[in-house]
């Protein structure tokens, strides 16, 4: 499956999302004048900045939000894009890094929990395609679940990519004074990656069989309206 085949690239690369499409995960949670707007989507950092304001105006119009939300939405998107762009041009070190991705999401009435391995070094990976296949294999019918799964994957990959910038910086400093020690650390990391690859075959279906570790078995539940109302009430209390 696309996104789960190791490329074998070990050297540092310039910072970007470790996926085929370099898209920034944007999350909005804005409260203003007694109303709340929440959304999550991806944004191409190469798009012109004026697209942000256009998007904010269109969103406010479509959702009939107070016009003051335009500034709030635009500023939040711009701030997150600026954070991403601050890393562009810096080296990030991925090495042979097979990482666990964890899902714990509720989308409408669907609750989905899963954990699987992802090759951070595969820059041809496609979270959206992976999410579509996952939902198909699990029999998930709600069309909003797939995009939410893909977004959750991208958010985690983004955080790890940021950490990889720090790793590249530390690696450069270490090589100046402790080359022997670096070699040992790299060997251990490589060995761990290979051990994980032996345990989990990336050629298998997204749905894990029962013979695999229980922690890697996906769980999908359909919640009742009462359960959803209770969860939303709890989320509202935590948001205050």
Curated annotation (Swiss-Prot):
Q: Is Chloroplast found in the keyword set?
A: no
| Entry-linked InterPro entries | SNF5
One GO cellular component term of this record is:
nuclear chromosome
| Compartment(s) where it occurs, according to its Swiss-Prot or TrEMBL record | Nucleus
Its keywords, alphabetically, are: Activator, Cell cycle, Chromatin regulator, Nucleus, Transcription, Transcription regulation
A single GO BP? chromatin remodeling
Could you say which tissues express the protein in this record?
Expressed in roots, stems, leaves, flowers and siliques.
Q: Which Pfam families match?
A: SNF5
Transport as a keyword? no
Q: What does this protein do?
A: Component of a multiprotein complex equivalent of the yeast SWI/SNF complex, an ATP-dependent chromatin-remodeling complex, which is required for the positive and negative regulation of gene expression of a large number of genes. It changes chromatin structure by altering DNA-histone contacts within a nucleosome, leading eventually to a change in nucleosome position, thus facilitating or repressing binding of gene-specific transcription factors.
Can you tell me which family this protein belongs to?
Belongs to the SNF5 family.
On assembly, the entry states: Interacts with SWI3A and SWI3B, but not with BRM.
Note from the entry: Was named BUSHY by PubMed:10325430 because antisense transgenic plants have a 'bushy' phenotype.
**Protein name per the record:** Chromatin structure-remodeling complex protein BSH
Q: Which organism is it from?
A: Arabidopsis thaliana (Mouse-ear cress)
């Amino acid at each position: 499956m696309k996104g789960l085949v190791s490329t074998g690239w070990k050297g540092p690369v310039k910072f970007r999302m470790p996926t085929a499409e370099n898209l920034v995960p944007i999350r909005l949670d804005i409260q203003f004048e007694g109303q709340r707007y929440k959304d999550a989507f991806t944004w191409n950092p190469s798009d012109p900045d004026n697209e942000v304001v256009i998007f904010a105006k269109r969103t406010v119009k479509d959702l009939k939000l107070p016009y003051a939300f335009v500034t709030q939405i635009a500023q939040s998107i711009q701030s997150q894009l600026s954070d991403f762009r601050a890393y562009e041009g810096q080296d990030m070190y991925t090495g042979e890094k097979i990482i666990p991705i964890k899902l714990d999401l509720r989308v409408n009435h669907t609750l989905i929990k899963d954990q699987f391995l992802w090759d951070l070094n595969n820059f041809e990976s496609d979270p959206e395609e992976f999410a579509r296949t996952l939902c198909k294999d699990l029999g998930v019918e709600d069309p909003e679940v797939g995009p939410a799964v893909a977004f959750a994957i991208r958010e985690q990959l983004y955080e790890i990519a940021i950490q990889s910038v720090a790793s590249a910086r530390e690696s450069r400093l270490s090589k100046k004074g402790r080359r022997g020690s670096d070699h040992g650390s790299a060997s251990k990391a490589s060995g761990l990656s290979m051990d994980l690859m032996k345990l989990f075959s990336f050629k298998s279906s997204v749905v894990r069989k029962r013979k695999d570790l229980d922690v890697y078995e996906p769980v999908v539940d359909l919640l009742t309206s009462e359960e959803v109302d209770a969860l939303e009430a709890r989320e509202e209390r935590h948001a205050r």
